[in-house]
Structures are given as C-alpha cells and as structure tokens.
C-alpha cells in the first residue's frame, strides 16, 4: 500500500520528466540561468489564473485588493497591480512599492496596529486610506493632517463581536490587538465627522485559514449585519 500524500498535489507546478517545473521551465534549467541557489521563482501565469478564477467566483461589483504582506516583492506587486483593483500595505516600505507599481493612491489602504507618526505622516501625504486601529490613532492622524494641510482618508477597522468558526487564525470574538471593539465604533465615527476627515468605510476581518463554505457564508452574513448596524 502506497503512503498517503501529506499535501495536495502541486497542480500549478507540474512535474515533467521527474523534474518540478515553474512557468514551463525545469528548476534545474532555472538554476542554471540564475547561476546560484537558493532563489525565488514565481509564475506570472499562475498568479493571473488564480485571480481570474477568484473573479469568476465573485459578483462583478466586488473589488479585489492584494494584501502585500503576502508577498511584497516588487516584481510580484507590479504584476498583481495589473490584475486587482487595489493594494493593502502594512509599512512605509510596502507603501513605496505600491506607489511605484502605478496603483492610484485612492486604491491603496494601510492596515496594522502600532503605526508610528512617521508612518501616519507618510500615508496622509500620499493620499491613501488609513484603517484606524484605535481612537488614539485617529487623534494623532487628525493632528498630522492639520500640520500637513491635507484631509486624511480613513476607514475604521472593527473588531467584530463574532468569530469565523473553525478558523486557523481568529481575529475577532473578544479582545484582540487588531481594530476597535464594535461597541466603541459609534463614538469614533462621531469624532471622524467632527474632525472633517474623509470616511471611507469599515474594515471587518473575522479570521483566516478556513476553506469551509458554511463558515465563510455565516461570517459574511454577520459582517454585513454588523456594517449595517454601525453605519
């Protein structure tokens, strides 16, 4: 009896003549071209195909954004920028790569806790959308906007009061370092209105590492219900 495979077959990287291939090229030949190992190799066609498959599975009105924390390599970002509707960054370094890709500032968002004043200042100056992680971050952002003479663009990252069931990484359903607790959001929204900042919407993320359709549908329903309740 043959041993059960430990992972799903890598159909995007087929084996030809007992050699793994990427982008139709054998790894041995790639290594010879590059002249050294180890190295990173990416298949643009595979990325294009996966984004296309995702678009075909979603309603047309849904926008797809690429989170650069997945892979901020400039060549990868440049290719993805031509496939998706926007980019999400988590540092000034990623922001520079995103802007260099030609993506419009209006289609770039900045998420993540612990943003320093240097990061907030750079994001406001660039004109991108900042996902607020706390009421204190909003106050710092307002002061920076006044200093630069630029009206900040903001979204509110909400820590939901529900969780994505069977999730490998839970980002909701209790105290978390990400986002503002749902019950505190109304006060933050009032302060945004008073400050004159441009409100762009909500960032609601309940978890990841979950491919169960029933859990995802339940979480999406709860997400829309929460957004309607807060709006």
Language-model segment annotations:
Residues 67, 153-159, 203-205:
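Short beta-strand segments
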């Amino acid at each position: 009896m043959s041993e059960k495979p430990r992972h799903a077959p890598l159909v995007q990287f087929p084996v030809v003549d007992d050699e793994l291939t990427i982008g139709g090229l054998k790894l041995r030949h790639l290594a010879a071209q590059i002249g050294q190992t180890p190295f990173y190799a990416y298949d643009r066609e595979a990325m294009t195909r996966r984004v296309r498959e995702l678009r075909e599975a979603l309603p047309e009105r849904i926008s797809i954004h690429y989170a650069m924390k997945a892979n901020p390599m400039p060549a990868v970002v440049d290719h993805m920028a031509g496939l998706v509707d926007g980019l999400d960054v988590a540092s000034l370094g990623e922001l520079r790569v995103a802007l260099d890709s030609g993506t419009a500032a209006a289609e770039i968002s900045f998420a993540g806790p612990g943003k320093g004043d240097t990061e907030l200042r750079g994001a406001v100056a660039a004109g991108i959308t900042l996902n607020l992680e706390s009421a204190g971050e909003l106050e710092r952002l307002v002061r920076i906007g006044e200093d630069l003479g630029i009206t900040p663009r903001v979204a509110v990252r909400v820590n939901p009061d529900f969780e994505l069931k069977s999730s490998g990484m839970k980002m909701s359903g209790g105290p978390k370092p990400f986002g503002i607790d749902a019950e505190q959001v109304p006060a933050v929204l009032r302060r945004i209105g008073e400050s004159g900042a441009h409100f762009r919407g909500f960032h609601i993320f309940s978890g990841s590492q979950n491919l169960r359709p029933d859990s995802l549908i339940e979480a999406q329903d709860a997400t829309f219900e929460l957004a309607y309740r807060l709006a």
